[in-house]
Amino acid sequence: MPQPDDLEKIADLTLEHYNQHAEDFWEGTRDHDVSQNIAAMLRYIEGERRFTILDFGCGPGRDLKAFTELGHIAIGLEGAARFAAMARAHSGCEVWQQDFLKLDLPENHFDGVFANATLFHVPSQELPRVLLELHACLKPGGVLFSSNPRGHNEEGWNHGLFGVYHDLETWRRYVSAAGFVKLTHYYRPAGLPRENQPWLASVWRRLKEPLGCRDPQLLTSR
């Protein structure tokens, strides 16, 4: 299990990688079509259709701009300084520069949290706490969307980035324990055989209180 110094290193090196490769990342992802993911989250948010959305790990701001163009109030959260600056410039939205492991979020504030290709960077021992913080920042009944590269619960470094590659059952256990109920899940890209769909997307609704245990050792027990 990583110690506090190791967690600091994990965050610092991952953010440094993104800062060093910010322009290449933007060029490689700016035209990605994630409209399926955006629609999947918005479909389940209840209430007047001008929602307050937290784009958790907003990167250079592609999806912030998309939410704004759909008429929603979008706020970005990004740990990498270069991404945060790019997101502000590209989207015109407010962007909070925060490390995922050192969050400072308002309570009961957002209708939806859009975590597209981001939560897999959170070490498994810290994931229960981070999910509880996302639960708390949502309004009651609010919606969490996540999409992560899937695997068999491997955890470690891959091309300069730290990641955890959960399978569906493990991911369900973590998110359910943090006080969410699953609404739907699917694999991406659409229309391909399952073995060619590396992304697991899922949509969750916030319950009033977390139901599960906060001990990550018990969360991962079979």
What is the meaning of each model-derived region?
Residues 2-59:
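Conserved class I S-adenosyl-L-methionine
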Residues 60-102:
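Class I SAM-dependent methyltransferase SAM/SAH-binding core
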Residues 101-113:
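A short acidic, Gly/Pro-enriched loop at the edge of an enzyme's catalytic core
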Residues 128-140:
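A short glycine-rich, Lys/Arg-flanked "PGG" loop and its adjoining helix->strand segment in the class I
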Residues 141-148:
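Conserved beta-strand signature within the Rossmann-like core of class I S-adenosyl-L-methionine
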Residues 154-170:
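Acceptor-substrate binding/catalytic loop of class I
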Residues 190-221:
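Core SAM-dependent methyltransferase catalytic element
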